[in-house]
């Protein structure tokens, strides 16, 4: 970590420049036996593609709120960093009806339908697989993200002192607080 790293996205960029091959995230699913290990470079690529999807396809802007209705999963970590990259506030377990966008897994589709904005669904299947039948009214993340760019540049600078993460207890953290 550099003293200049003030947002999670900046922290990831520093890790990528230091040692892109280093393992960064290991995910285990005891129910399915799935194990996923992502290097810094692979994780950063998923984040870049997801941030491009957010910014270019879903028209998300800094300050927008994204209700993140996902369980503890490696793809949840990707979405958290992608939101930070764009300047979107990731609202963990947030109210879909009050959010500008919603990202959901298969178990929270009905709750996510309350969002009048863009809706993205993740199957949470091994290796980031697609839904066998895409849920009506949702973009299937596994279909939409592969074609996105491998590098991300925000249209507007992200301020480390702006809200970055909304917590289930109602508290909020800035990007700088998340890094601390």
Question: What positions do the PLM features span?
Answer:
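Flexible, charged surface loops at secondary-structure boundaries
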Residues: 17-18, 59-62, 94-100, 113-116
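Conserved AMP-binding/adenylate-forming core of the ANL superfamily
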Residues: 25-60, 157-180
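ANL superfamily adenylate-forming
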Residues: 101-180
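ATP-dependent adenylate-forming carboxylate-activation enzymes
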Residues: 70, 91-101, 106-108
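Short hydrophobic beta-strand segments
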Residues: 24-27, 62-72, 102-104, 165-167
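Conserved AMP-binding/adenylate-forming
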Residues: 36, 53-93
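A short N-terminal helical cap/helix-turn-helix that marks the beginning
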Residues: 2-26, 149-160
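Long terminal accessory regions outside catalytic cores
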Residues: 1-8, 29-33, 42, 75
